C-alpha cells in the first residue's frame, strides 16, 4: 500500500480563498477516487454550537472531505477569538504546540490516502513568541500549494511568499489563482506574469484559475483545478 500523500495550503494573505481552494482540492481528490481528509490545525474564530466548538473553515473542509478526522486531529487548536493565532491563544491562555500538530498529522496519514492541511492566514503569521506558520510547514515537511488572491498587489505578494517558502527549504508544488476581486484590471496579464516567474524561479506550475464565485462552491471551483497534475507532483516529490 502506497504511503499517504499530504500537502500544505498557504496563501498570499488572509481572506483570499485558502479554504475554498483547499475544499476544492478535496473535492477533486474525492472525484479521483481517493480517501481525502482535511486538517485545519489552528482555527481562530470558533463558536459554541450545542456545546461543541465549531469553526466555519474547518466545517467547510469536513463537508468537502470523504474521510472525517476526529476533531482533535483535524483541529488540535480551536480558538474562540477571531484574531491572529498568537493573540487569540494568549487571550485564552493556550500554548500552540507544534509537536502536537505534527503528531495529529501523523495520525491523520493513517486514516486517508491524501491529507490537505490548510494553514492560517499567510505564510508568516506568528503562532508563538518564536514560531510562525512557516515553522509549522517546515515541521510538517510538506510540499506547499500557494493560493494567490488575484487583486492589486498580488504579484509582489505571491513572489515574496514563494521566496519565503523556498527559503525554508520547502517546495512550492503548484499555485492557484483565485479571482477574489471581480473588478481587478488585467487579471489575465497578472496571471501570465506569475505563471512565467513562478515556473521559472521555483518550478511551480499553475494548477488552475478559479473564477469569482458567488456563492463560493468547492465543487465548481474543483472543475477549474488540475488535481491529476498535483497528484503526480506529490507522488514524485522527494520524501
UniProtKB/Swiss-Prot annotation:
E.C. numbers: 6.3.3.3
Compartments, record wording: Cytoplasm
Chain positions recorded as ATP binding sites: 15-20, 57, 118-121, 178-179, 211-213
Residues at which Mg(2+) binds: 19, 57, 118
Active site: 40
UniProt GO molecular function: ATP binding; dethiobiotin synthase activity; magnesium ion binding
InterPro entries attached to this UniProt entry: DTB_synth_BioD, P-loop_NTPase
Required co-factors: Mg(2+)
Enzyme class: ligase
Quaternary structure, from the entry: Homodimer.
Described purpose of this protein according to its UniProt entry: Catalyzes a mechanistically unusual reaction, the ATP-dependent insertion of CO2 between the N7 and N8 nitrogen atoms of 7,8-diaminopelargonic acid (DAPA, also called 7,8-diammoniononanoate) to form a ureido ring.
Name of the protein: ATP-dependent dethiobiotin synthetase BioD
Amino acid at each position: 500500500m502506497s504511503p499517504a500523500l499530504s500537502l500544505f495550503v498557504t496563501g498570499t494573505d488572509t481572506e483570499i480563498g485558502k479554504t475554498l481552494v483547499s475544499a476544492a482540492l478535496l473535492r477533486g481528490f474525492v472525484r479521483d477516487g481517493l480517501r481525502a481528509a482535511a486538517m485545519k490545525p489552528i482555527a481562530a474564530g470558533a463558536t459554541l454550537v450545542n456545546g461543541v466548538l465549531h469553526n466555519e473553515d474547518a466545517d467547510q473542509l469536513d463537508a468537502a472531505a470523504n474521510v472525517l478526522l476526529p476533531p482533535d486531529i483535524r483541529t488540535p487548536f480551536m480558538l474562540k477569538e477571531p484574531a491572529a493565532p498568537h493573540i487569540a491563544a494568549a487571550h485564552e491562555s493556550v500554548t500552540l504546540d507544534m509537536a502536537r500538530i505534527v503528531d495529529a498529522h501523523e495520525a491523520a496519514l493513517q486514516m486517508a490516502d491524501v491529507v490537505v492541511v490548510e494553514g492560517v492566514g499567510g505564510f508568516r503569521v506568528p503562532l508563538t513568541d518564536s514560531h510562525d506558520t512557516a515553522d509549522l510547514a517546515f515541521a510538517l515537511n510538506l510540499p506547499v500549494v500557494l493560493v494567490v488572491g488575484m487583486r492589486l498587489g498580488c504579484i509582489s505578494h505571491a513572489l515574496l511568499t514563494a521566496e519565503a517558502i523556498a527559503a525554508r527549504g520547502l517546495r512550492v508544488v503548484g499555485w492557484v489563482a483565485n479571482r477574489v476581486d471581480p473588478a481587478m484590471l488585467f487579471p489575465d496579464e497578472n496571471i501570465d506574469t506569475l505563471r512565467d516567474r513562478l515556473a521559472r524561479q521555483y518550478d511551480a506550475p499553475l494548477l488552475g484559475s478559479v473564477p469569482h464565485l458567488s456563492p463560493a462552491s468547492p465543487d465548481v471551483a474543483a472543475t477549474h483545478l488540475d488535481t491529476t497534475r498535483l497528484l503526480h507532483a506529490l507522488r514524485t516529490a522527494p520524501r
